[in-house]
């Protein structure tokens, strides 16, 4: 079985990685990561490019000892939320059996389009949340490092992600 995980992944963090592990435990053999809002980057809400987010997914898989061949990545531009978007999304990814989402609007439009939806559990949502991680990075709070895998933290630093987030929030 193949599942779709649709997200912004700003950044890809341990909450996302926990959903990956949960999905494999549930019997999904492959996961398709659709990196949303691919056309927006260098903003406070979306500081990383689509390519950088794909790299974070790959690094997180490697750090966790998960097989890369079980991950398929795709990107999609920023879309309005509508039932028509479901068909557009599905045309950008390989066939999937299910979408894994906690977003009730996304779940509803995919259900209405006839796609199976499964709601993953929350994993340490108090800390593993993109908005909070970006806030910690902006404030110079090193707690952000514990929310992503070691290779992802190094990657964020190597690409100037810390400075980028601080700059984007200062200019907002």
Curated annotation (Swiss-Prot):
This protein's UniProt keywords: Nucleotidyltransferase, Transferase
GO molecular function, a single term: nicotinamide-nucleotide adenylyltransferase activity
Similarity annotation: Belongs to the archaeal NMN adenylyltransferase family.
Nucleotidyltransferase keyword on record: yes
PANTHER family recorded: BIFUNCTIONAL NMN ADENYLYLTRANSFERASE_NUDIX HYDROLASE, PHOSPHOPANTETHEINE ADENYLYLTRANSFERASE
One record GO biological process: NAD biosynthetic process
Keyword Transferase attributed: yes
One cellular component term from this protein's GO annotations in UniProt: cytoplasm
Name of the protein: Uncharacterized protein APE_1986.1
